[in-house]
Regions:
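Fe-S-dependent hydro-lyases/dehydratases of central metabolism
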Residues: 22-34, 41, 58-77, 81-812
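Acidic, Ser/Thr- and Gly/Pro-rich intrinsically disordered linkers and low-complexity segments
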Residues: 39-48
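Short, small-residue-biased leader/transition segments that mark boundaries at the very start
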Residues: 1-16
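Residue-level detector of extended alpha-helical repeat arrays and alpha-solenoid scaffolds
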Residues: 13, 17, 49-53, 84
Length: 812
């Protein structure tokens, strides 16, 4: 019936556009119908006046993979040699081939088929890449300052509009503001020969998360169309910041073949002796080197790797880091995925033809140091490295393709991840992964009509793909809305593991975890691998004793304050924080590692001793077993496999065969921060400093103050204990405080609203076993109901205790 409908489109240009052009590529059901229909047109089994054979092949060439590649292979091996040759020429441009496709090529080649041989020869030479146009030598840009200070990804793609992220046209309407959208549109009209460069003046671009939807929105408003036949998918955005681009956001920019520029247009003013000059508030005085105010015309030279003024008479800043050979490859190919899949395809073809692949792509940068020990992250990367050319150990700065152990997909970005998987033509999870999890935490707080429509579809897709899902597509087991990072922390059963998660707070107390955009998550799910440079590390150790009246949260804040005091700038940005937490259990260590996302660190890794690691692994085993008992395991018995691997790791540690991860004594660090616990003598407050006269210093995460600074003059508007930044111990403290108040006064009265949201159901179960949940329930004026969850966000609060559903209530 679909073919009959499509065949009736003769003479209707609008119908042709909407039914043929505007179809999402990859493995979508519409793409399957489209590919088969185009095959019928090529074979003249059907006809549409507006689509001749040449256009039909052109349309197939833009469909990326899956059913389109299947059709192209059918046509390449067709008896009509003219059709076969045309299909082969299109196939030579495609990179999203999977095992079923490559198996067909190999079989035909082994049977002596010349077309198959011709295609494989082309792949071995990487003609799908070499025949693409080079990036322009000169890129003319006009600036648009989106804001002064750090720009959160929430400005580019608001969290409260997460339901529409997979609908690029609709979600694009929430980009910054209507005023900004109009101003950008006017700049494009006034400068048709230039690209609009989005700027964070006096700040860092893209802090807070990787936010693929944020990059999509920037590309939608300022980038270029990826294909004339694919709606609302743009590539090549250009973003910039005085202090550069946040590391995880920069990775996402690379996914779309974009450019991220560190402007360095403001510097700290120095005196004649080279000392930084401070103002009356003790803050460095900034000096402007050149302007990037909205409407400024600049030129990027991709050959000299410099940023120039409009006339190209003055060099403004070196941008070599923006145009490494690998990044230029991403730009040329329209994104990093094409390079990842292209390399695999080239290696496959070369192997079949028994030849070396053509040296087309940038060789991975391999940095060795014979007399240097390894940091913890360097050890993890070396253990998990794939395809190394030598046995020499790699150090920071080396480009490495690594095996990924655990992958997490988040529910507000999951629909985008599923779209990316469809676009890559992926249909099943990589068997090399230890496990993968689809969360339901960000839609736990408000189960509105949008979530009710979107999330069941997402859970079904991910379940079919091979993930453990928070919600049961069959509706049998109890929905688990636990915070994604907490679940991944439990699922991580090896301190040498690499974890990729679809959320900026993907930080673990075991192994090393990287927050990633939905596309990188999709790539990890499909291939079981990730590619990135080994990051530099900053070592954090502690001295002194922690006073009994302060909390570990105060240690977290003080680490930030003492680091800034020691170095004058954020040495954590873009690096791994290697924290030596010693005897902290995994839940407490998680509190520290989760915070590192706020300091713009790329990741964090915890160094603990053997006994503590064993206890942490036992906690993981218990919690995974609980998931199994709830009926959450899949047909592959992923969860059972994790329990078995945890048991094996415990035995390795006990026997001394493979002790807990530790860096070498002579490891090289970018910096070493020593936190003096004796200095922490009162609670520490992280202040967004919203009234700072310097706008760029607001919302920076850099203002840490002792509670005495506020002289007890502040009123508390609302208290919140929960979500990913707390652990069970924090919940027990709240319970004990209620007991203490009850004992003292006979009752507990609330003078402000208090919201308590356990991160996971496991923690609630444990609090019930340990007698702490009872007191929380006793004084709760509201308690979540799984059978009747909230369907709208709460905007007004009474002075009562709210016991909210486990999940990401704070953010959402």
């Amino acid at each position: 019936p679909a073919y009959e409908i499509l065949s009736g489109l003769v003479g209707s240009e609008m119908c042709i556009r909407d039914s043929i052009y505007n179809v999402l590529p990859g493995t979508t059901s519409a793409a399957s119908v489209k590919a088969k229909f185009l095959k019928r047109l090529i074979l003249k089994d059907d006809s549409v006046v507006e689509i001749d054979q040449k256009l039909a092949f052109d349309l197939l060439s833009h469909m990326k993979g899956g059913p389109s590649v299947e059709v192209l292979l059918d046509l390449a091996f067709h008896e009509d040699t003219k059709i076969a040759e045309q299909a082969a020429n299109v196939l030579k441009t495609q990179v999203f081939l999977y095992e079923a496709d490559t198996n067909r090529l190999e079989e035909k080649y082994n049977a002596g088929n010349k077309i198959a041989e011709d295609i494989l020869e082309s792949y071995s030479e990487a003609e799908f890449f070499t025949k693409l146009n080079a990036i322009p030598e000169k890129i003319k840009v006009v600036t648009y300052v989106a804001a002064e200070g750090d720009i959160s990804t929430d400005l580019l793609s608001p969290g409260n509009q997460a339901h529409s992220r997979s609908d690029r046209e609709l979600h694009g309407q929430c980009f910054i503001s209507k005023k900004a959208q109009d101003e950008i549109s006017q700049l494009k009209i006034a400068h048709p020969d230039k690209s609009v460069m989005l700027v964070a003046e006096k700040g860092t671009m893209g802090v807070g998360s990787s936010r693929m939807s944020g990059v999509n929105n920037v590309a939608l408003w300022t980038g270029k169309k990826a294909s004339p036949y694919i709606p609302y998918v743009n590539v090549a955005p250009i973003v910039a910041g005085t202090n550069g681009i946040s590391p995880i956001f920069l990775t996402t920019v690379g996914v779309t073949g974009g450019i991220g520029i560190d402007l360095k247009n403001w510097v700290k003013k120095k005196d004649s002796d080279g000392n930084i000059i401070l103002n009356n508030d003790g803050e460095p005085i900034l000096e402007q080197l050149y302007t990037v105010e909205t409407g400024t015309e600049l030129t990027i030279n991709t050959k000299t790797k410099k940023l120039y003024n409009k006339e190209e008479t003055k060099e403004l800043v070196d941008v070599s880091s923006s145009f490494t050979r690998q990044k230029v490859e991403f730009m040329k190919a329209g994104g990093s995925y094409s390079i990842v899949f292209g390399k695999k395809l080239q290696n496959f073809a070369a192997n079949i033809l028994n030849k070396d692949p053509a040296p087309v792509f940038a060789s991975p940068r391999e940095i060795h140091s014979e007399d240097q020990g390894l940091t913890a992250v360097e050890k993890i990367f070396n253990k998990n490295a794939v395809g190394l050319t030598s046995d020499k150990k790699l150090v920071a700065g080396s480009d490495v393709r690594v095996k990924v152990n655990i992958v997490g997909s988040q529910d507000t970005t999951g629909l985008m991840t599923s779209q990316e998987l469809e676009a890559m033509a992926a249909t099943v999870i990589s068997p090399s992964l230890d496990g993968a999890y689809q969360s339901g935490c960000h839609t736990a707080s408000v189960w509105d009509i949008k979530a009710q429509d979107n999330i069941p579809r997402l859970m079904q897709f991910m379940h079919d793909f091979g993930l453990i899902t928070a919600r049961d597509p069959k509706g049998i087991y109890h929905s688990m809305t636990d915070v994604i990072h907490k679940v991944l922390n439990d699922l991580t059963i090896d301190d040498w593991a690499i974890i990729i998660g679809g959320d900026s707070h993907t930080r673990m107390s075991k192994g090393i975890a990287f927050g990633a955009d939905s596309g990188t998550v999709a790539l990890a799910l499909a291939t079981g691998e990730a590619t990135m440079p080994i990051p530099e590390s900053v070592k954090v150790t502690f001295k002194g004793d922690l006073h009994s009246h302060v909390d570990f949260r105060d240690v977290v804040h003080s680490t930030q304050a003492q680091m800034l005091k020691q170095f004058g700038e954020n040495v954590f940005q873009g690096r791994v924080i290697e924290v030596h937490i010693g005897t902290l259990m995994s839940d407490q260590a998680f509190t520290f590692t989760d915070w590192t996302a706020e300091m713009k660190a790329k990741a964090s890794v915890c160094i603990s001793n053997d006994d503590i690691l064993i206890e942490s692994l036992k906690i993981s085993k218990k919690r995974i077993q609980t998931m199994i008992e709830k009926g959450m395991d899949n047909k592959n018995q992923t969860l059972k496999g994790l329990v078995d691997k945890a048991s094996l790791r415990i035995e390795e540690i006990k026997s001394g065969e493979r002790p807990a991860l530790k860096p070498d004594r002579n490891a090289k660090y970018f910096a070493e921060v020593v936190v003096d616990l004796n200095e922490i003598n009162e609670p520490m407050i992280a202040d967004p400093d919203v009234s700072n006269v310097d706008i760029s210093k607001r919302y920076t995460h850099d203002t840490i103050r002792p509670i005495s600074y506020y002289r007890a003059e502040k009123t508390v508007d609302l208290g919140f204990v929960g979500s990913c930044m707390v652990h069970k111990g924090d919940m027990k403290i709240v319970a004990q405080m209620l007991r203490n108040l009850e004992k003292k006064s006979g009752e507990v009265k609330f003078k402000a609203p208090l919201v308590v949201a356990a991160p996971t159901y496991n923690i609630i179960d444990e609090l019930k076993e340990e007698g702490d949940w009872e007191i929380l329930e006793k004084y709760a004026g509201f308690q979540f109901d799984d059978k009747n969850p909230k369907q709208a966000a709460r905007t007004e609060y009474e002075n009562i205790l709210y016991l909210e559903r486990p999940g990401c209530n704070l953010c959402m």
